[in-house]
Amino acid sequence: MTIKSYREDLMQLVSYLREQRQKAALDVTDWSMRALRGWLVWLHEQGYSRSTISRRLAAARAFGRFLCRQGALQVNPAQSLRGPRQERKLPHFLTQEQIHQLLQAPFPGTWQGLRDRAILEVLYSAGLRVSELVGLDLDDIDLREGFLHVRGKGKRERLALLGPAAQQALTEWLAAREAFLQQRRTCGTPAVFVNRFGTRLSSRSVGRLLHTYLRQTGIDTRTSPHTLRHTFATHLLDAGADIRGVQELLGHKQLTTTQIYTHVSTRRLRDSYRQAHPRA
């Protein structure tokens, strides 16, 4: 929240309270739970979005904390108010054509190109979080069996599967990695993916290289490394995969976290039906 928007939100609240109290000068007794609840109802009736109401409530809470620090209030009534439940946005994902274009974008004639192709293939094939990807060590890979040992959120461990294309890309990268590190005389790092200095690649670097290929292919630049994880899950469910299996592959603790992807698949199915069925 910027200072300007914070000030505007507070001034709107003050204006509302003045009108309700029918007085020009307010005091701390006007900053009550009842008054603030009425203000939230009024915001809703005026048609403000949930995100706008939440932002304005956050400004009111911050101002209430300030009044408490100054000794003007003993308790901040705004702190106990519950804001509107935010709508859960459907995850952004790529089509099969787009993911094919993206995976073909890195030039395999350089060590960076081999690395980048392996990164994109593994993100899509295994559905990894970018933090899980850059955290991979050589001992985490079993190319013969086609799986990765992944350390996910909350230190939960799981096995992630690799498809043939990802296995091939990773095999080619590991050979190039060894030659590159020998050339730099920095063979000590266990990291699977390294930067030009021979040290572990960062999550930010993965984001930057992805955007390079997005611009190159003309794919929506809102795409992030996490979009490939969304794409992985959506494509699996579109192809009829069991949601419990997808939950395990993603490393989700709760099934409800995975179910957001079923909404995406259902929406796509409905759109296809409306476009194709003569009586839809």
Regions found by a protein language model. Give the residues of each.
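Conserved catalytic core of the tyrosine transesterase superfamily
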Residues: 1-280
